[in-house]
Amino acid sequence: MTSPSAPSSAERPRLPGALDGPRLAAAAAEHGTPLWLYDAATIRAQIDRLRRFDVIRYAQKACSNLHILRLMREEGVHVDAVSEGEIERALAAGYRVGGDDEPIVFTADLLNRSTLRRVVELGIPVNAGSPQMLDQVGRAAPGHPVWIRINPGFGHGHSRKTNTGGEHSKHGIWHEHLEESLALVDRHGLDLVGLHMHIGSGVDYGHLESVCETMVKQVRMAGRDIRAISAGGGLSVPYTPGDPEIDTDRYFELWDAARRELVSELGHPVRLEIEPGRFLVAGAGVLAAEVRAQKPVGSNYFVLVDAGFNDLMRPAMYGSNHRVSVLDADGAPRASDARDTVLAGPLCESGDVFTQVEGGDVEPVPVPRTDVGDLVVFHDTGAYGASMSSTYNSRPLIPEVLVDGAETRLIRRRQTVAELLAPELEPGPALSPRPSRDPR
């Protein structure tokens, strides 16, 4: 079989913004591999593409590092939190609570007791994805500000596991139960801020138009004098060559037409929010890993790197594709002929493979020939990379680095094994020793 050609310099994925090969290699040498790197200018450029919306509300679950959150806040971006921990992250990053512009909104499909106490204490608006949330908030704090997140009966997503609407999605209040939810709002005197619909459409503008029409229909059915609507998130990112780039102006214009229709009916301004996550940060981030082994296995050729799905979960969970490039230890690109390669990690887990499709089938991809010590760069990993990482196989969390113009700074140091073990070694109730079995 003839080896495929390596991508030309024009086809080779580019590092984001001010990040180049030598800077990446220098960061890897200083902080070790694997590590995450983000480019601040790329994030700012993505924010600017959405400035026509009244409120950009960052879905911090995409990348919740405090330094990224501070960057968002400095750019005037508001934040969405989906857990008590994310509320505390937003506060630690300098977000305030209160005010008409609602810097922090809490979105979920349930409220545990601790989080309920915290949102009530802080007065954070709750975007409710179940009727029980409305009832629980109302009992704890009559008059509390709320949104209603509606599941309109259809959905969209790049994977079945990311579909956020329809009867197979847990998210949102089923559209046929809107009246029941409004009755709870009335019973507890809750302050209904607006309606939220997180469906996403990517570049399917016909689908997006249907989503916008459904929002107008739901507001009419509600018959309430709301102050805002939220378009949710779901803006697509071109992960692979040939993926179309989303037209953010067209996206806004479709939503703005829906908003203007509501303004004419309600007789006052209606705030239009959007809730992007990966759109803002995916293209700004890369994961750099070192080649540690390579071997033929039957008809496949494996290159093994020191990052695993504990670091980058998306390929194993969704079958997601991330473009890769290869640099030598000094940061120069490898430009040799490509070879069909299976890229895999160090975990004691058969599914620890980066080149697989949804369902788990291994799919070799053309990769320039590598040497042990080279750096493999996984592109467009700024979203749902570090924030979804784990300590599986007792592997500590890895560093994060932010490149901002000429400055390169560490924004999360590498976790130590001692820190990983600490919660299990802290003083607690003494355990009665169990007798050892006689090995004979």
UniProtKB/Swiss-Prot annotation:
Pathway involvement of the protein, from the record: Amino-acid biosynthesis; L-lysine biosynthesis via DAP pathway; L-lysine from DL-2,6-diaminopimelate: step 1/1
Cross-referenced HAMAP family: LysA
EC number(s) per entry: 4.1.1.20
Modified residues (N6-(pyridoxal phosphate)lysine): K61
Positions of the catalytic residues: C348
Catalytic activity: meso-2,6-diaminopimelate + H(+) = L-lysine + CO2
Organism: Streptomyces coelicolor (strain ATCC BAA-471 / A3(2) / M145)
Name this protein carries in UniProt: Diaminopimelate decarboxylase
Region (Disordered): 421-440
CDD domains: PLPDE_III_DapDC
